[in-house]
């Protein structure tokens, strides 16, 4: 199923942050399973606080309105006291639409 329309705020959010895009593509690779914060951080090679900012928003640097969770692309599920982040079905559809446009970006990622 393809999307006829992608919210411009999603495009803006992903274009403003390579880290948001990396996290989104990592979670797409893990779909339908989730992954915890420190593992995301390790795989995208970024500080956990920056990863959390991309996922949930952070004062100043990462606007909460453009966070992956706020945009409906990622969800946080708590299992046994551990927060697991996973791509939503909507997030999966967005990535599938965008991945052809981002083929050069995807090839540059080294998991």
Curated annotation (Swiss-Prot):
CDD domains cross-referenced by the UniProt entry: HTH_ARSR
Q: Which InterPro entries match?
A: ArsR-like_HTH, EarA-like, WH-like_DNA-bd_sf, WH_DNA-bd_sf
The family database entries (Pfam families) matched by this protein are listed as: EarA
Its name, as the record gives it, is Uncharacterized protein MJ0905
């Amino acid at each position: 199923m393809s999307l006829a329309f992608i919210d411009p705020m999603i495009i803006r959010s992903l274009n403003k942050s390579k880290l948001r895009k990396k996290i989104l593509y990592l979670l797409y690779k893990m779909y339908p399973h989730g992954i915890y914060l420190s593992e995301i951080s390790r795989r995208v090679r970024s500080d956990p606080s920056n990863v959390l900012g991309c996922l949930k928003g952070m004062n100043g640097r990462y606007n909460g309105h453009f966070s992956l969770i706020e945009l409906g692309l990622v969800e946080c599920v708590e299992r046994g006291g551990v927060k697991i982040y996973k791509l939503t079905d909507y997030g999966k559809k967005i990535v599938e639409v965008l991945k052809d446009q981002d083929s050069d970006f995807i090839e540059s990622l080294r998991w």
